[in-house]
Amino acid sequence: MARAYGANASLLAAFEPSYGANPSGSTDYWKLPFVSTSLGSEQGLIANDLIGLGRDPSAPIRDVMKVEGDMVVPIDLRNFGLWLKALLGAPTSVGDVDHQHTFGSGQPVLPSLALETGLPDIPAYFESSGVMVNSVQI
């Protein structure tokens, strides 16, 4: 079995048209630098509420799928605006030559991302959709 090296890992990101909807085939993904990621999906089991099938309880049913985890990314000039847009929503932009982007908090709907972490040495690729940025630490 191949061994994955971090230097060869890749992170691709694209904004989704609506929450959980995969970007279309013509959407360009950005290749982003990252330090580490622990994104992963989990689907637990919940008790089945069906009654009337005898004394034995029914088998549990699947709960909703959750994608959780942390991602460490560097603060760089090229991609910092993308992370601000994911955290605060689309900016208000003014200017034709000298652009000025203003980000504000409190927007009712925030964008979601489709992220793909790739380990080409194995090869293994993990896609997570509906990813939203919760917080940023500097």
What function would you assign to each model-found segment?
Residues 1-138:
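Signature of extracytoplasmic/envelope-associated structural regions
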